[in-house]
Every structure is written in structure tokens, then in C-alpha cells.
């Protein structure tokens, strides 16, 4: 019997890097509302008292970058100086330029289906049947802990909670099946006056226990709640934040490979984002079809070229049919050219700010989470 531990982490919407991601995606959404043909690569940097928004954007839209940035920061919960960061009073700097004409000529085409990839690169998508959302369990529950922290904070149930927080979940497996939670780490920013006793009790009763399955918890489960003790200084006052620095949190928590490209602030001509979404869509439909228990897809592209330069399917010994057959089915049922996958997943819409906290995958409101091709795949593969 094989036994092992696997761990994934998540961070809250108030983590500095996630503030940056949400600002970048809020800018993207506002532009897409006005100009569906915009080219956007928006990067944000936050530190004590300031937010710098930059990047390359070519658009006919007009967006009030300063007011939008302030709104995002305040929506997260940084709206007075005792937090160490205040969306009402922080400096907002704008350093946005235009996308290179050299890139434009490789992407834009007279026939939209010939649209080339915005860059070269590799992208991965993954799915597993160990949760109902076909995501790895460790990252799923790490995200849910952070969502619960935000819910409890914003409802006022634990008034001393502050926006910055991190979670980490270690699961124990035997013969590739989850048998329990080995360890939970939850660190949350808090106000000055709360005692460590009240903090530990509140986090355990209001955040951890309502989220983690009780049958996975035991006397052996280890809980690390604010293990350093005090966590008053947090958010951008404690650490600077930058768009695109939480790429494993954004995806599969380390349970699958990552091509290296970040998502936030990029419109769908950037295959770093759109093809990673398409790869998740493909992998999820393969698992939903019962063709594999686990599935990882790799795609690759060349700048200015429409067709993917490669498609790989890996099922880790869980496939019900050969991987070669799965590759041919992927080519038959999914249009993975940049324009094709944009249309297939309806990606030109202002949905991206919501992706920028608590993970891009495993959340049913997003179009790449549909399993509408599962039955077609199953029939084509010859499974009853």
C-alpha cells in the first residue's frame, strides 16, 4: 500500500499579489465592455501608499484607471489607514503604453480564423475526479478556506479579521485515495486588540471546521493557526504585490505542470491565458466523459501561427482508451486555434476580475468549466 502526503496553498483576495491581479483584471474588464477588439497586457504593482498600473494596451476605450484602482482596493477591504493601505488616499500611478505593432501584425488577420497566437509558449490543463468540480482536492479546500475567511470578515462575524490571509492544506493519500487531512495552516491578518486565544478559536470554529470535511479530520490532524503569533502588519504594507506572482495558486496547486505564463491582465489573444483555459476545458471534458480518472493536456503555440504546434494528452495510467486516441479526439472536437478557442469558450466578455482571486478553475460560473462535450467524446471513443 502506497502512502504519501500532498500539499497546496491559497491566498486571500487581500494578499498583495492578488490585489495586483484584481486591479489588472478590473482594467481588462472595463476595456472589454467598450472595445471587444482591444489588445491588453496590464500589470500592477502595489506597495505601502501606492499602486502602479502599467503595461501595453491598444484600445478605443477610455477607462478612469485611478478611480477603478481605488474602487478595487476599497472593495477588497483596504479603506482606512489602520489597515496600512487605504484605497481612498493611496497614490495611483499610470504607466500604460501601446502594444507593439510588430506583435499586432502577427496576431491580426483579415480572416479571424487565421488569427495567430499572441506569443509562443506552452500551456497545461488538468482535471481529476477526486472532487465534484474535477479539481485536485488540496487546492480546492485551500481556496474554500480563503473564501470562508473573506465571507466571515465581510459579514462582521469576526470583526477583527483583516483582508490579508493565506491557507495551506496537506492531505494524506493511501493507494491514491484521500484518507484524511494531515495538516492545515491558516494565517490571517488581524486587528491589534484580538487575543491569540480568541483568534485561534474563531478561525477554527468559523473558518476551518465549516469548510473541511469532518470525516477527514482526526486527533492526528495538525492545525497551525497564525503560527508566528502576531499578524497585524499585512497587505501591501507588509509585502509588495505584483500581477502574475501566484500562478500555482491560480491553477492546480502544484498537482499539475504549469507552462509559466500568468493570466491576469491579459485579454484572450494572449494564449498564456486563453489556451490554458481551453486546456482545462479539454481535460475536464475527458474526465467527465469517464475516459480517464486524471488527465493533463499540454498545448504549444508559435507567435503569429494559428494552429497549435503540439497537443499532448497524459492520463497517468488511468485512461480507458489510448492516449493517442484521445489526442485525435481532441483535434476532432475542440478548435484550439486562438480565434477558435475564443469563440468556443466565449472569452470576449468582462468576466476576468472574478477569476483573479480563489482560483481560475473549479468554479462553475466560468465557461471553460462546462462539460458539454463529454457525451460526444464518450460516444466517439466507443464507451457505452
UniProtKB/Swiss-Prot annotation:
Cofactor(s) required, per the database record: Mg(2+); K(+)
UniProt record, GO biological process: one-carbon metabolic process; S-adenosylmethionine biosynthetic process
Positions contributing to ATP binding: 15, 164-166, 230-231, 239, 245-246, 262, 266
Binding locations of L-methionine: 56, 99, 239, 270
Compartments where found: Cytoplasm
One GO term describing the cellular component: cytosol
Region of interest: Flexible loop: 99-109
Any GO MF annotation of the entry: methionine adenosyltransferase activity
Keyword terms of this UniProt record: ATP-binding, Cytoplasm, Magnesium, Metal-binding, Nucleotide-binding, One-carbon metabolism, Potassium, Transferase
Catalytic activity: L-methionine + ATP + H2O = S-adenosyl-L-methionine + phosphate + diphosphate
PROSITE patterns: ADOMET_SYNTHASE_1, ADOMET_SYNTHASE_2
SUPFAM superfamilies referenced in this protein's UniProt entry, alphabetically: S-adenosylmethionine synthetase
Binding locations of K(+): 43
Cofactor binding mode and count: Binds 2 divalent ions per subunit.
The protein's enzyme class: transferase
Pathway where it operates: Amino-acid biosynthesis; S-adenosyl-L-methionine biosynthesis; S-adenosyl-L-methionine from L-methionine: step 1/1
Domain of life assignment: Bacteria
CDD domains per the UniProt record, alphabetical: S-AdoMet_synt
Any matching Pfam family: S-AdoMet_synt_M
InterPro entries per record: ADOMET_SYNTHASE_CS, S-AdoMet_synt_C, S-AdoMet_synt_central, S-AdoMet_synt_N, S-AdoMet_synthetase, S-AdoMet_synthetase_sfam
Binding site for Mg(2+): 17
Similarity field: Belongs to the AdoMet synthase family.
Function text: Catalyzes the formation of S-adenosylmethionine (AdoMet) from methionine and ATP. The overall synthetic reaction is composed of two sequential steps, AdoMet formation and the subsequent tripolyphosphate hydrolysis which occurs prior to release of AdoMet from the enzyme.
Subunit field text: Homotetramer; dimer of dimers.
UniProt protein name: S-adenosylmethionine synthase
Amino acid at each position: 500500500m502506497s502512502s504519501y502526503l500532498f500539499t497546496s496553498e491559497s491566498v486571500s483576495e487581500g494578499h498583495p499579489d492578488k490585489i495586483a491581479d484584481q486591479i489588472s483584471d478590473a482594467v481588462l474588464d472595463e476595456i472589454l465592455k467598450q472595445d471587444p477588439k482591444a489588445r491588453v497586457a496590464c500589470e500592477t504593482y502595489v506597495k505601502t501608499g501606492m499602486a502602479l498600473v502599467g503595461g501595453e494596451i491598444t484600445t478605443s476605450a477610455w477607462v478612469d484607471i485611478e478611480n477603478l484602482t481605488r474602487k478595487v482596493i476599497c472593495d477588497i477591504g483596504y479603506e482606512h489607514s489602520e489597515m496600512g493601505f487605504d484605497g481612498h488616499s493611496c497614490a495611483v500611478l499610470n504607466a500604460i503604453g501601446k502594444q507593439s505593432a510588430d506583435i499586432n501584425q502577427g496576431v491580426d488577420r483579415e480572416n479571424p480564423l487565421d488569427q495567430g497566437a499572441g506569443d509562443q509558449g506552452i500551456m497545461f490543463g488538468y482535471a481529476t475526479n477526486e472532487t465534484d468540480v474535477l479539481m485536485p482536492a488540496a487546492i480546492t479546500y485551500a481556496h474554500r478556506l480563503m473564501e470562508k475567511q473573506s465571507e466571515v470578515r465581510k459579514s462582521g462575524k469576526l470583526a477583527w479579521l483583516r483582508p490579508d490571509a493565506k491557507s495551506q492544506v496537506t492531505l494524506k493519500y493511501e493507494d491514491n485515495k484521500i484518507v484524511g487531512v494531515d495538516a492545515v495552516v491558516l494565517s490571517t491578518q488581524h486587528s491589534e486588540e484580538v487575543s491569540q486565544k480568541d483568534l485561534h478559536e474563531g478561525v477554527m470554529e468559523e473558518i476551518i471546521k465549516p469548510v473541511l470535511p469532518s470525516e477527514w479530520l482526526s486527533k492526528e490532524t495538525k492545525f497551525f493557526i497564525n503560527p508566528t503569533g502576531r499578524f497585524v502588519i499585512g497587505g501591501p504594507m507588509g509585502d509588495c504585490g505584483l500581477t502574475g506572482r501566484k500562478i500555482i495558486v491560480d491553477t492546480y496547486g502544484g498537482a499539475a505542470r504549469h507552462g509559466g505564463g500568468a493570466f491576469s491582465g491579459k485579454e484572450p489573444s494572449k494564449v498564456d491565458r486563453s489556451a490554458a483555459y481551453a486546456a482545462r476545458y479539454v481535460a475536464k471534458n475527458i474526465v467527465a466523459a469517464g475516459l480517464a480518472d486524471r488527465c493533463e493536456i499540454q498545448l504549444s503555440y508559435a507567435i503569429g501561427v494559428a494552429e497549435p504546434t503540439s497537443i499532448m494528452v497524459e492520463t497517468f495510467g488511468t485512461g480507458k482508451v489510448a492516449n493517442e486516441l484521445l489526442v485525435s479526439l481532441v483535434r476532432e472536437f475542440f478548435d484550439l486555434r486562438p480565434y477558435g478557442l475564443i469563440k468556443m469558450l466565449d472569452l470576449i466578455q468582462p468576466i476576468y476580475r472574478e477569476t483573479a482571486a480563489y482560483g481560475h478553475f473549479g468554479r462553475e460560473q466560468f465557461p471553460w468549466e462546462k462539460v458539454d462535450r463529454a457525451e460526444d467524446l464518450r460516444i466517439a471513443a466507443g464507451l457505452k
